[in-house]
């Protein structure tokens, strides 16, 4: 938000660099799956895929029969189980298919653009979990009316999901002088926003190892017209430090039982939840970093949480992890499409496919075509007056690997690496090819401050021993800092009447940084034997809210 002139030549060069496939020259690692040879239509492998279900993309010529059959089923109030195409239905009969439905439901006012993007051609079919997925895929791929078959690959949060409840008495001082005008009592412990080298956080803490948000808050702290979709676990929309900044759907849909008030649980196909066995508060923690309510006299601050006057950015909960239900390609793609059709301009994604499965952009496009098409659909939507597309931000991953995970590593998306209060990379962060920018993700072990060197944000009391706040670590925690900074940038642009192309704004975001490489010489830290291996591989630098 700092009013400075960007060098257009430099920006265009950077953008060009970011537009190339960041992984094309990377050989497969020993633990990576090789690029698979399939029958041509089968996109990926059944490794780590959901049982009893397959995703297929029909050719356009098959759609009239499918849609007529769907209409006939609707008239009798029965579930669609057959396509109306003999060659396909022979296989569906043999598989004893119990459900056949569009991946992306009929979209009302957005149906025309849905069909223009080809998303209406994706269907998911369900059958007994005992069926052999590979054999079923081979049979379906042999039918002329089917153009692609995709297994439902599972997704993983970019965090160990361990939470450390915040306890004011254990932390000692809960209020201190920090360079900010907000009265949130625990802002002092959010070193990732304002790092004054407090020794209680870590004896190696470095002043300025933060996102430089205090000065940015003097210019803007958010705007309700900017909607950030939290694609994650469910966000606790009743949390006292989040409720005022939750997005409210002006037109809940019958497709979602008129219960999609703040978003939807795509994993369980029901209302948003957060207190089930298996939930960790991951989505609520991420949401708090983006936009916990500022200056409300309680708890913590969010990067774009406003000034306590109802002026924070809005948080939409697009839930893809629910209790013991693990997200997968189907669930995430539906969530992404929902966000695009309901006004989100930033997609906050602290998750990904298990590291090493994809090592190039081409592999991602070829082997996860439905995921790719849904994300590209989001990127094409103009849901914010200040931006001509949707901004997609992913965590780079936590495998300590010299490449970004996917989808984060894809050239059109932003992949976020993680650093700690010592201004050095976190020991778990991925780095190298495909990684774009760094942000605070913390380290809850290995530094002198223990969990206090993690990221402090909102939690669900139901899953964290009654605590509404706590620490977590991971590129999952770094990612929402960049989403929050981007949301601040769009908020400021709206206030100033500025308009940017998606490419222009991404370039601004990736050049509004502080360098880290000068700190990555020969040497070590408590959790990393040689920090020099990260030099030139953490992205363009550390995100800086004031510079944007």
Predicted feature residues:
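C-terminal subdomain of the subtilisin-like protease fold in secreted/lumenal serine endopeptidases
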Residues: 342-351, 359, 389-390, 491-548
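Extracellular S/T/G-rich loop segment that most often corresponds to the catalytic His/Ser-adjacent loop
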Residues: 258, 405-491, 547
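Generic structural signal for small/hydrophobic residues in well-ordered secondary structure
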Residues: 56, 100, 125, 146-149, ...
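Active-site neighborhood of phospho(di)ester-bond hydrolases with catalytic His/Asp-centered motifs
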Residues: 348-350, 392-397, 416
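C-terminal motif of bacterial Sec signal peptides marking the signal peptidase cleavage site
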Residues: 16-17
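Sec-dependent signal peptide recognition
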Residues: 3-10
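Primarily auto-inhibitory N-terminal propeptides
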Residues: 20-190, 217
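Active-site core segment of subtilase-fold serine proteases
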Residues: 166-327, 331-369, 383-388, 451-467, ...
